[in-house]
Every structure is written in C-alpha cells, then in structure tokens.
C-alpha cells in the first residue's frame, strides 16, 4: 500500500559490519580466532583495589613513528601485538606496559562509531569515539582492512590476546547513554520513540549533551545493554567495562548488569562516570549518580573530589591544588586517601565521604578529558621552573597510586604527557590556548604519544613504576572494606595541617606515608620502632635505620617501612629489608 512507510536499517544486534557500519554482516566467529586464542587465560584480579588501570586510545598508542611499531600497524589494533618495540633504547607500546607494571589497559571506545570515515584512511581523521553507531560491532578505522568484516574482529582479538599473554586485562569504554544519530539511529529506525527517553512534549531528552539519551529503564533497552555486555565479555574475553556518563542509567539496570557480569566472571571490573552531561527526565534518585553510590556498592565511580584536590579545579586552568600551592585542599585530600569512605578521624559532611566501600573509588588526576596533569601544571604553576613542576607531578602520582581505592592513570602521564594545540589562523598564543583541553577530534600532532618524552623524562617514569611496584607489594595499600580502612589506616598528627601523613599497620607490617606540599623541608614523626626509607622522592630505597622522626624534602612524598624484628630468648635481630 502507498501509505506504508519503509525504512532500511542495520540490525541493532548486528555483531559484524562492513565499512562505516552501514550494513551488517553474518560471520562465523570461530573463524576469527587467532591461533592459540582458546588457550590464553584471562589475568586474575581478585578485587578492583588490586587493579592499576592505564587509559589508552588505540590510535594514540602507536600512531607516532617513535612508537617503534611497523608502519602498517601504527594506530591499529595489531600494534598492541608488536613485540620488542623501542625508541632509542627505551621500551614503547606493549613493552612499556609490561615495564610499568599496570594490571589493566582501559581502551577508549572501540565499538563502531560514526565520526571517522573508514573508507578514507588517507584523511587522517581522528576521534575519541564517544559517537556510537553500532554497539556490538568494532570500529573499523583501527583495523588494517575496514572492508573485511572479519578483519577488525580478528585483529582486536589479537590485541586482547597479546595483553592477556602478558598478564594485562582489557577494559572497554562503553557508551550506551546516547546514540550519535537520533532520528537516523538504528534504534529509532527499528522502533521509534522506545530506546530513547522522550520528554512530555514529544521531543528527545538530552541528558548526554549530545542530542539524546537512551532509556535504560525501558525493559528492552535494559535487555539490549545486558545482551551486548555479555557478548563483549564472552566473545572477546573482556576484563572490565567503564560506563560513559553512567548517571544517565538507572540504578536498577546498573545493579542487574553487575549481577549478570558476576555470572560470567565476578572479577570483571565495572566503573563509570557518576554524572550526566545535562538534565534527564528520570528522577535523580533513580539514576546512578555518585551521591547515590550506596545503592550500587559493587560498581566504581570516578573520584573527581580527589582529582580536583590534587591539581585544582578542572574547568579553571589557573586553579591550584594541593601539589601546586592550594593550602585549602588537605581536608578533601585526606578523604580521598582513605578511599572516600566514612573514616573515624574525618568528621566531615556525609557527601564528602561518598563511597560505600573503597572499591568504589576510582582515584585519578588525569584522563582523556581536559588538560593533562602536566599541561595543567604548566598553566597553573607557570612561574615555577620545570624541575619544580616535575616534583608537583610526582607528588600527584604518589597520592593517586598510594591512596585506598583503584588508581587510574592516562597513557603517557608517567612521562609528562602534553597535548600541544594547533592555533587557528590569527589566534595569538597565550598561557592556556597553546594546550588542548578537549582533544576529542584533534590530529595526531596533539594526541599521539611522543615516546621520545619517555627518554627525556625517564626519572618520572621510574618513579611511577616504583610507586606501582610498592602498591602491588602490600595489601595495606589495597584494602577492600571500610572496616579494614578504619582499623588499619590512621592519620598522624602534624602541627601543620597541610603536611599530610598516615600510618598503615596490620599484622606487624607498618608503613608511614608523608606528603610535603611546601617548597622547604618539613619534619614528620614516626611511631615506635625502627624504620627505613622504603621509597624516597626518586622512587629509591635507603636501608639506613631511622627512628623518632624524619625530614620530607620539598614538594615530595616519601614512604617509610618499619623494620620487622625476630625475637629469640636473648637476642632480637632485624629481618631482611624489602
């Protein structure tokens, strides 16, 4: 009949597609498995607090020639499988990941997105990927042949396999909160006005800030999300999921997803952003906001409180934090150090101690959004020398990595990643505009990792590496419950409130961590017993016994460890220092 309205669309459940994701493909997934795929075991991670997450964009990782990756693999999934990569003697790419000691790679979106034309690779287009088109298909621009539906699947499995073989888990950044297209999306073409939230006036609500938001509270949208996540977790052996704008999803759906992932593997990480990009019509008490965290206690949330206390407010580039001279940041910082759970020594407002358990706190001071930590310090501490700013950066790293919760680091942060911005014609350079604070579609000049910086700032990398090794070496830095945090983490008294120190103690093991935000030496006290300097401001150890007190250098963090003793009838001997 002439009044029948016909639409053509790719299946919303399509798991493979052709170039640019316009047409679905039927694929035998068994034929896409790399050799040895079935034999590779997933890395073990008992608890989120045992993870050290490293955020990577597939293209950034290897696009620059300094990556040492084969030219045809640069910017592609398969770059992660290139072995032995170096730049002038320093490890790059996967060799770098192994050397640093992180446990998980968090990949910015690799699901098929709309804003790079896969048929024109010579245009060198770039996008972070938060523009979802097909939720169950892989992005083709990261494959060596976007026209072959199997190619991207096989090559992404090679990426996963290469990381798993080296004991590194894979976290996917998933963007179920909106679609890039609204009326033209596969959701609307398949079942109009169901998969998206609609306002009372019939318009699309826009809690994402991207033109629409999906309706996770609708039964079939919820089912779609669960089915999709189960597919990624089983077919690709994914080890974790990070939810973009997670607060747009209703709490009930978030909890059901956690239950479903537990059935596959309870060690799968699940965390997300506890905020939205705009106003949603769903009542705030039903949404997975950070302040509702006690209603979904098994899911992690980005800790913007500790982020801003460390380096200053994100949206004012000149704003300073604890490491760069803000003397009012120490209170918020203490809460973050204790995993953002209620602590017997912190008598602040309930919302400040927002986490139900320390496993919920994703501690960070840099991610793909906004200025890198180094660029932020170059703006807010522009009058300080580079050497002083390096001290600030290392102090920030110590706070993130040694706090209770799950540490999260951006690719290249460990060697002072910078995102230089290309100025527009006629634009005069100033303190702020020479750095990109929103590089979502900036070229490789801005976004790609320049591995020569690792060579240039090797001492910074070595410090991050030493911090990660220290964290992984003792469960005291990785406590799972608020009860443990309250029993075994004690803030120590200092005459100066801005000098922060705390003691971690259990079963005869004792650490004292001190943070000095001043430009001069500061003295700190020690508990009873003999200690040695486990980690100095360079990441090194000094076995000389110390008792009573110690001096912390300017703008530095240091860690002391009590020397264990073994008692015999007439003799007490120190045990081996480690």
Walk through the language-model features, giving the residues of each.
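The feature marks proteins involved in alpha-glucan
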Residues: 2-75
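C-terminal beta-strand-rich structural cap/linker in extracellular carbohydrate-active enzymes
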Residues: 546-567
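Conserved alpha/beta catalytic core and glycan-binding cleft of carbohydrate-active enzymes
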Residues: 258-259, 263-426, 513, 518
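Loop/helix patches that line or flank the sugar-binding groove of alpha-linked glycan CAZymes
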Residues: 356-529
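Conserved, mostly hydrophobic/aromatic
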Residues: 56, 107, 232, 243, ...
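Hydrophobic faces of well-ordered beta-strands that scaffold small-molecule active sites
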Residues: 54, 105, 170-172, 241, ...
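Substrate-binding/active-site clefts of carbohydrate-active enzymes
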Residues: 59-236, 249-265, 269, 281
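Short, small-residue-biased leader/transition segments that mark boundaries at the very start
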Residues: 1-5, 572-576
